[in-house]
Amino acid sequence: APEDYQQGNSFRIMYVHVPSALLCQSLYLFMGFAGFIGLVWRMKLTDVAISAAIPLGMMLTAVALITGSLWGKPTWGTWWEWDGRTVSTLVLFFLYFGIYALRQAIKDSSTKANATAIIAMVGTLNIPIIKYSVDWWYTLHQPATFTITEKPAMPSEMWLPFLVMVIGFYCFAGHNVISRMRLEILRRESRSAWVRNIATSGEKARYVF
């Protein structure tokens, strides 16, 4: 991608910052949806999905905050600005961290699953705040460059690599969460006969799932 005529090469941070910000929000919505299904239909797999998404979501939120600070210094002249989107993204990080810490503190699996599901569902209220904070309050963040109904504001030499990065991030996240889910299932079922058979026979878990 070419240099930006105003920001120079510093705008390239966007190719990591924006995909990580989008993905950490998507993962939290995924957790909230899984929590709702788990509470209504009592599906154990939903708690597995939530536990698998937490570490990646927390890491990506941290990446979004750090890269945002790195981008903000040359663009805004400051490492940190207490505007709506920055603060709501920080709240998202604390939600991830809080759920992670709660899961470590609670030993009973049923109580852990229910508490996690409730907090995940309530926390989804923060996602629209992140999304629409640039419209609701004064903020240094610019409105969305990409919309479904309008042509991208940036040239194709810039938005095509950006699109590749977003798709790549989502593919990585999908693979990571599914892999963590498989490992979590094996851990929870470690005393089951079928898991012992896999361990003793040397078969790969992909033949089971």
Residue ranges of predicted features:
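Polytopic transmembrane helical bundles with strong interfacial aromatic enrichment
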Residues: 1-209
